[in-house]
Amino acid sequence: MIIKNGQVLLFEEGGFVKRDILVKDGKIIKVAEGISPEEAGEEIVDAKGKFITPGLIDAHSHICISEEGMGAIADDCNDYSDAVMPYLETIDGINPFDLAVDTAVKAGVTSACVCPGSDSVVGGICSVVKLKGKVAEEMVLERKAAVKCSFGENPKRAGYSFKTRMGNAYLLRKCIEDAIDYKHRKEEAAKDGSYFRTDIGMENMLPLLEKKIPLHAHVHRADDVCTAIRIAKEYGLKLVIVHCTDGISIVDFLSKHDYPVILGPTMYPRSKLESMGRCFETAGVLNKAGIKICITADHDVTPIYYLSVYAAQSVRAGLDEIEGLKAVTKNPAEVLGIDDRKGELMAGRDADIVIWSKHPFDYDTKVEKVFLEGQDMTI
């Protein structure tokens, strides 16, 4: 397949440029001017006058585990069994037939990080998925992508044994310390050949200790952001700061630490105290300070299929336009560790391609075609 004559988003070129895209076997083979039709086989898509981007990526979502329109019976986001549950994995709660999936794809969203809810201090393991497939295993790109933890209002109000920020920080530290102890005991048992009983939760924590995956930290208030950074630095952990609602008030502090930020949701009522400071201006301020940002819908808090709208509103509020496009494509791919496959239109990447009628941030634009790994999802 060749997609011809479109305005293709190429970050190394500084924006949209006229190019053709050659796709074979679900992969982008070449992005160049004047690709010969003979290279395409029978399928040629004329995108003259259209804008073409990578498939959009939401770096923090509850799609497929908090199902749209189904109520509490299909909400597998928060388990409410304990404050610390590293043994839970979102892959075991994913329903590929969530109604939101089809709507999201038709709005240009092709991948997402599916996370446990935020009412436990340690909620479980996040999985990165492509929004295509009939079983979870077909969807999963990274089964164990991050350890979800939460600070502030949500775990405080959940009613577990500890009800203060101090107590919740202690529980997270204790979980990490338990994992360190588990790692040492496992290594000693391997040396002397003694019996060692595997613990599912602690096994899930080991990639975090080894810096293979990050701590995916739900934080809104500025002091909670600082606590998450404090704990990450204490243990030398990778960290992704999620929500960061009050980030604009501590931008100088954030800029001194090399942690990416996933901003949002923003386009919703101030439903709790911690959301009082939410504003679209935060994205531009953090970006100008050199902080890598992603933009999230936090589905189903706000709909994932309006992800491009949230990015556009951030641009309207001061975020650079190209940085706004990166915040829903390239940046989340890098933060989620899937940038070898997703996030940019270049040779070797998956053919996750969205064709828009106008610029993606134009109020009147429409998604005309979506290809996910080369498959036309809009048929």
Where are these predicted regions, by residue range?
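N-terminal metal-binding scaffold of metallo-dependent hydrolase/deaminase domains
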Residues: 1-39, 50, 375
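C-terminal cap of metal-dependent C-N hydrolases
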Residues: 4-10, 334, 346-379
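Divalent metal-coordination and catalytic microenvironments
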Residues: 6, 21, 26, 49, ...
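Metal-coordinating catalytic core of metallo-dependent amide/deamination hydrolases
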Residues: 39, 128-230, 234, 272, ...
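Metal-associated gating/positioning segment near the N- to mid-region
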Residues: 50-116
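Active-site gating loops and adjacent loop-to-helix segments of metal-dependent hydrolytic enzymes
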Residues: 67-94, 135, 140, 150, ...
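His/Asp/Glu-enriched, well-ordered alpha-helical/loop segment
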Residues: 68-69, 73-81, 85-87, 214, ...
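Divalent metal-dependent hydrolysis catalytic cores, especially in the metallo-beta-lactamase
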Residues: 83-89, 97-132, 141-154, 214-215, ...
